[in-house]
Amino acid sequence: MKQLIVNSVATVALASLVAGCFEPPPATTTQTGFRGLSMGEVLHPATVKAKKERDAQYPPALAAVKAEGPPVSQVYKNVKVLGNLTEAEFLRTMTAITEWVSPQEGCTYCHDENNLASEAKYPYVVARRMLEMTRAINTNWTQHVAQTGVTCYTCHRGTPLPPYVRYLEPTLPLNNRETPTHVERVETRSGYVVRLAKYTAYSALNYDPFTMFLANDKRQVRVVPQTALPLVGVSRGKERRPLSDAYATFALMMSISDSLGTNCTFCHNAQTFESWGKKSTPQRAIAWWGIRMVRDLNMNYLAPLNASLPASRLGRQGEAPQADCRTCHQGVTKPLFGASRLKDYPELGPIKAAAK
């Protein structure tokens, strides 16, 4: 009887585990390549519906204003990023940013109500850099964001800290049961520890490929060899790349797939994953640019913020929050299902000539 109870508990636990890792049927498949080659995008209608309802909560665009009057930098003090706008454009943009980032906290989340030009609050300094980053994305990374662009809401979704940011994780020994920040579950298998993280789709792979590939631009993601033996095309200098590099690459791929809410063949050819050109889908080239965009954001905009952020906003190694694909995409192939919010706020796009 005791053994029966133990077996029943184990069965229920296993069922709960499996149910938590997979989406329930039905699933739909849209053919994306030649028939019979397993080229298709797999989606779950219930999940897609829930995400569409979530993304439909975007605050409506504020009424447009006339671009008349002197530059706002001549009206207010310490306006260093949006100083080329008119006062009306500036106030409209500031109001929108408040709705996107701190709707509960209001303007005083960033500003001192007695001195709006004061930099005493750290969000003021951070917000300035994030505005520069947003403009840089919309100006320099159109290979990835096209003309759709991004706004503060793309990542923040109504919260001061975007819901999907991550922190760098220390490399832990295989027998160390410490749980890193974004690891949801730790299990012991055959004498070593398996860390299962939502960010890598609960795969038993490298739980932090982001530090290796997205926090710097020194590491090559490509790991599949061009020949069987000897391994050609994936060497690191004169050394062959270790198996751990393959684990990290596939963990990153699992993360990208999960972040976009799609499967591998959205970008890759089912027959030959490593091939480019006509054998890959157009989305793969867009993803290639996206990886390099995220590296730029992490290295040049986010990582340097560690000097401006309080300890409560820093990771265990004293680092600022980092971005990955999920930060913007949040489970869909195009953030906000491709709806362009930049068209309503062109002030966040490429810098235009100052008002006269």
UniProtKB/Swiss-Prot annotation:
Coiled-coil features, chain-numbered ranges: none
Binding site for heme 2: 130, 152, 155-156
Gene deletion effect: Lack of photosynthesis.
Keyword Coiled coil tagged: no
Lipid addition sites, S-diacylglycerol cysteine: 21
Binding site for heme 1: 94, 107, 110-111
Keyword set, alphabetical order: Electron transport, Heme, Iron, Lipoprotein, Membrane, Metal-binding, Photosynthesis, Reaction center, Signal, Transport
UniProt-listed InterPro entries: Multihaem_cyt_PRC_cyt_su-like, Multihaem_cyt_sf, Photosyn_RC_cyt_c-su
Marked site positions, Not N-palmitoylated: 21
PTM text: Binds 4 heme groups per subunit. After the signal sequence is removed, the N-terminal cysteine is modified to form a diacylglyceride thioether, but the alpha-amino group is free and is not N-palmitoylated.
GO cellular component: plasma membrane light-harvesting complex; plasma membrane-derived chromatophore membrane
BP term (GO), one: photosynthesis
Binding, heme 4: 144, 325, 328-329
Signal peptide bounds: 1-20
Primary location group: membrane
UniProt topology in membrane: Lipid-anchor
Compartments (UniProt record): Cellular chromatophore membrane
Domain of life per record: Bacteria
Residues noted as binding heme 3 in the record, renumbered to the chain: 253, 264, 267-268
GO molecular function: electron transfer activity; heme binding; iron ion binding
Task of the protein: The reaction center of purple bacteria contains a tightly bound cytochrome molecule which re-reduces the photo oxidized primary electron donor.
Summary of subunit composition and partner proteins: Component of the photosynthetic reaction center composed of protein subunits L (PufL), M (PufM), H (PuhA) and cytochrome C (PufC).
Protein name: Photosynthetic reaction center cytochrome c subunit
Gene encoding the protein: pufC
